[in-house]
Structures are given as C-alpha cells and as structure tokens.
C-alpha cells in the first residue's frame, strides 16, 4: 500500500490490524488537531468504534490519540480532571491512505494510571501470537526494545510524558471551545481539569527544585556547570524513583556585566544576552541536561517583578531612597542568623529596585532603573511554585550570602514561610589553586571540556566540597569511563535488558539523597562482584545504573553497536579458528574504541 504524506480532511478514521492482515477494530470520525513533522494528533469525542464482531459504541469521554511518525507505538490519552490515563499500543509504524490511519497491533500495551502507576499488559497474548501469527525475530526484538524506550520516557518524564506536552494541547482545545459538553458527567470539564492541574502544582508530592542560573554576558566555564549537572542528577533520580518534579532554572539577562559588555562592544544588551543564552543552551545539550522544566528570563518578567515589589511595599518592608528602593532587613526575625561573624558585619538593606542612567531602563512607580538581583529569583519561585516552600534551593556556595539570605527574607516577608526546606550549596571548582573565575582568567570553558569526564569527577566528589582540577584527576576519570564503556558494551553484546529492581533503586536513591560516596561504594561492589563471577544479573545491575547516569558515550556505543557487534563476532570467529593474526586486527578496532 502506498502511503500519503498529507491529510485531506479534518476528520479521519483509524484501523487496527492483526499481523495476519485481519482488521479487528476501527474508529470513525477522529478529529485532526495537529499534524507536524513529528506527530499526528487526533481528538476523540463521540467517535464511533466498531469491532470485528460487529459490536460498536461511541467514545463517551474526551481523549487524545498521538501517532508519532515512523515509530512503533501510538498513545491514547484519556483526559480526566483527576489525572490523565495513558494507554500505549505497541504497533507497526502507521501508514495513511483513503483518509485512514492504518497500523498493525503487536498486542503488548503499557498503561499509566493517574497516580503514575505503570503496568505492562497482554504479554501472554503477545507470546501466544508469536506462535499463532509467526512473529519473526525482528518483530520480537523491536517490541522488547520499544518497551524499554517507553519505560525510559516514563522514567525521565520526556516526550508525551512531559508535563507540558498534554497540557498545552488541552489549553488549545479549551480556547477553541472543544471541551464544552452537554452531559452532566462532563459539565464544567475544562474548569475542573485546570483547577486540578493547579492543585497538582501545589501538591506536596511534587519535588520542587530551583537553581540560580547564569548571567548571560559571556560563555560559561565548568565551574558554572557544576551546580546544574549535580541538580540534574538529583532531579532525574527523583523522577526514576517515581516522584513528579518541577525544576526551574532562571536566566539573568539584566546585569551590570551585560551593560558593560554592551558599552564596550557597541552591541545592544538584548543581543548580547540572547547570544550567550543560546550558547548556554548548547552547553546544556552537550552536558545532557534535560530535566529543566522552566527557564524564565528577567526581561520577560519585569511587570511581575514590579508587582512583587509592590506587594512587599504594602506589607511595610520597602524603604524609598534617593537612588531606588531597598528591603528593610531589620523586620525579618533571625535575618543573618546562619552567617559568620565576618559576614554579619556586612549586613545591610539591599536594593529591590535601583535607579540607573546606564543601559536599558525600566519603570517602577516613576523610577527609571532595573530590579535588584535578589528579587528576580524570589519572584520566579513565588510565581511558578505558587508561593509554596521548595524542597531544594540550589546554587554555588558563594551565593549563600547575601543572595540566598536575601531571597529567603523576601519570601518570608510576602508568604510567611521559608523559601526552601533544604539549601544545596554546591562546592566551587578550583583551577591552578584558585576559584575558577573569568576575572582571574583561570577558566576552562564548558564547551571545550569532556562532559563525561566532568560528570565522573562530580560523582566522585562530595557535593559541597571544592574540586581541584588537575591532570591526575582528569586521567583518573578517564580510567573510570573506560571501565564503564567496556561493561556497557558487554551488556549490549549479551542482549540483556535493563533492570529496575531494588538494587538499582538503592543506588539511584543515594544520588537523590546527594550521598555520592555511598553510591560509588555500592556501584564498585557490584562491578567487583561481576568481574569475579561474570554473572549476567550483576552486569545488568551495573549497566542499568550506568545508563541512568546518562553519559554521552552511551549514545555513541548504541549508535555504533550493530557495526561493532559484527566486528566482535568476526574477532571471535578468527579466535575459534586460531587465526590469531587476523583476530588481533579486529580486536584492535574494538580496543581503540575502548570497548574491550
């Protein structure tokens, strides 16, 4: 059958077939709401379903049906105020002809319930149909691999599991009056759906994390990257353990440094900040940081910052001066309690809004200037987390005072609660026996440093302790990476599957708890146990943890695996033939890649 690459009508049909070509179910009248390079997305309400037996019924609740292009699954999402229900079908890639989406169903399905329980179903049916329909090995391998991929999507909350993916579509449906229903059961559906969504954002079960972000006036160095790599590991560990997370990482795009760079270069502040924000996003991609949910910028939120300062003013915490507005720290009980005696000497009121004659000016109650640095983070936390207390507020150890102390003071003033349950002050990165700093000129740009080496260095260090970058430290990290690469290649070579058992979860829990020392101790125990016993279950545990750590080398090994598997098999073949000269040629290819 020849597939068409476009959709002709607003409403289409869907047909599901068995492997022998029998049509077993059809959906009539599904509405197309999106068709782009990645997905076709349908909206089902009052669509009619017909079974092979002749039985038919009408869809009685709204749902989305996502058909990723050239993938071996599709996703049905039942929209419910109490929480969406996912039903994922393992299938052939769909084709489109005669105004109909058509696919072959491969029996196994994955269900994800509103409270995030996950279940794999119809495995027995799949095993039965391997015999009845004669599924070839390629189909069986594809199905098992796709299940692993989908479980990984779920663990990382990516793709259609990401919090914004479905909610953005539902927002669009609501705006287009497509969530208005006559039945009593569905009355006020849109209102109830979004009320529950807001409640869920406030729900204590959400693991709430905020990390102070960079000032985008220059390229970031590895010292800047330490906090975000560490927090990404912690957040992904929480996701792996079943927690719903919200991770916010701000971008400071108003600052004296940006203004000075603008004056020197005669390039606008906006162009400078946009340039280095783009560069920062490239570095985040290189370091495989994917857990960040929101990255608010100061320039996009000036009005909100003004309202936030006004709310502090109404409560009597703001003092007007000739050159701006400051926060009265004397009104905050225990302000500076955690400070050293030396720091306490520096305690003073801090600017919420400062008048300025340089750079772009913004208006606060007739005063032209810009917001103070300490207010932006407080506003973002207050706004995005609905005035709730964070689980973790992270940043470099140098932000402890005054930045974090002043954030907390403002939050207490507005909300009568502390800004966070736990502070995470990540240690500094030292180079040439000094803190890595652009002003000292002793930086290693993040784009020039190997991201896997950096992650190994961080994992093998206490989160709050300083790290001294030396050649010896880098070489030690390379040794560990080479060890992990060999283990991971062997895992793939044996066609093993990832493990999500208590042994793996224990190690992931240590990452979530910021106990990197215990994590390394346990992982090395399993590596030693495997090297001694060569038991597949030990290798599976180790490789599952290595995969969780999300190294770049994993992607490369998986990408080249088919080619290197052939090289490995040829090498083994020559060994059996005792043709050691040719065997060594192929062995060297694998050694050069660090795979054996």
UniProtKB/Swiss-Prot annotation:
ATP binds at residue 438. The keyword S-adenosyl-L-methionine does not apply. Residues 1-199 are annotated as: Unknown. Keywords: Aminoacyl-tRNA synthetase, ATP-binding, Cytoplasm, Ligase, Metal-binding, Nucleotide-binding, Protein biosynthesis, Zinc. GO terms for biological process: cysteinyl-tRNA aminoacylation. It is found in: Cytoplasm. Belongs to the class-I aminoacyl-tRNA synthetase family. This is Cysteine--tRNA ligase. It comes from Mycoplasmopsis pulmonis (strain UAB CTIP) (Mycoplasma pulmonis).
């Amino acid at each position: 059958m020849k597939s068409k690459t476009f959709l002709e009508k607003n409403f289409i049909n869907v047909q599901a077939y068995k492997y022998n070509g029998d049509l077993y179910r059809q959906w009539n009248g599904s509405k197309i709401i999106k068709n782009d390079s990645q997905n076709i997305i349908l909206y089902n309400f009052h669509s009619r379903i017909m079974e092979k037996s002749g039985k038919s019924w009408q869809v009685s609740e709204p749902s989305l049906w996502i058909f990723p292009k050239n993938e071996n699954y599709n996703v049905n999402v039942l929209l419910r105020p109490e929480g969406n229900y996912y039903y994922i079908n393992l299938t052939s890639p769909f084709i489109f002809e005669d105004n109909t989406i058509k696919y072959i169903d491969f029996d196994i399905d994955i269900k994800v319930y509103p409270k995030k329980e996950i279940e794999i179903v119809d495995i027995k049916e799949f095993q039965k149909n391997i015999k009845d329909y004669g599924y070839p090995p390629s189909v069986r391998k594809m199905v098992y691999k796709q299940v692993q991929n989908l479980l990984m999507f779920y663990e990382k909350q990516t793709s259609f599991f990401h919090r914004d993916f479905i909610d953005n579509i539902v927002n669009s449906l609501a705006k287009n009056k497509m969530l208005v229903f006559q039945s009593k059961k569905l009355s006020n559906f849109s209102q109830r759906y979004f009320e529950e969504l807001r409640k869920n954002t406030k729900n204590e079960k959400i693991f709430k994390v905020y990390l102070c972000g960079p000032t985008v006036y220059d390229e970031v160095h590895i010292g800047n990257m330490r906090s975000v790599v560490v927090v990404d590991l912690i957040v992904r560990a929480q996701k792996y353990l079943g927690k719903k997370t919200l991770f916010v990482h701000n971008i400071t795009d108003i600052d004296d440094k940006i203004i000075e760079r603008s004056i020197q270069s005669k390039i606008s502040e906006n162009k400078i900040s946009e340039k280095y924000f783009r560069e920062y996003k490239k570095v985040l991609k290189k370091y495989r940081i994917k857990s960040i949910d929101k990255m608010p910028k100061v320039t996009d939120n000036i009005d909100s910052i003004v309202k936030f300062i006004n709310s502090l003013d109404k409560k009597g915490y703001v003092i007007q001066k000739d050159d701006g507005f400051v926060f009265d720290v004397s009104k905050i009980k225990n302000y500076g309690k955690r400070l050293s005696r030396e720091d306490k000497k520096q305690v003073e009121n801090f600017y919420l809004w400062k008048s300025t004659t340089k750079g772009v000016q913004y208006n606060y109650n007739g005063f032209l200037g810009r917001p103070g640095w300490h207010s932006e983070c407080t506003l973002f936390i207050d706004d995005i987390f609905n005035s709730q207390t964070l689980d973790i507020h992270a940043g470099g150890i140098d932000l402890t005072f005054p930045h974090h102390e002043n954030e907390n003071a403002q939050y207490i003033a507005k909300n009568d609660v502390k800004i966070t349950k736990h502070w995470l002050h990540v240690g500094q990165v030292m180079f040439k026996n000094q803190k890595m700093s652009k002003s000292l000129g002793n930086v290693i740009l993040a784009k020039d440093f190997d991201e896997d080496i950096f992650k190994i260095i961080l994992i093998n260090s206490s989160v709050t302790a300083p790290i001294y970058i030396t050649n010896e430290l880098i070489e030690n990290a390379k040794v560990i990476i080479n060890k992990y690469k060999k283990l991971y290649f062997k895992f793939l070579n044996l066609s093993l599957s990832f493990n999500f058992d208590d042994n793996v979860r224990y190690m992931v829990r240590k990452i979530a708890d910021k106990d990197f020392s215990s994590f390394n101790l346990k992982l090395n125990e399993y590596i030693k146990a495997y090297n001694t016993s060569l038991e597949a279950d030990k290798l599976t545990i180790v490789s599952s943890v290595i995969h969780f750590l999300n190294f770049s080398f994993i992607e490369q090994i998986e990408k080249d695996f088919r080619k290197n598997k052939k090289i490995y098999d040829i090498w083994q073949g020559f060994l059996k033939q005792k043709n050691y000269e040719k065997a060594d040629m192929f062995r060297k290819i694998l050694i050069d890649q660090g795979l054996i």
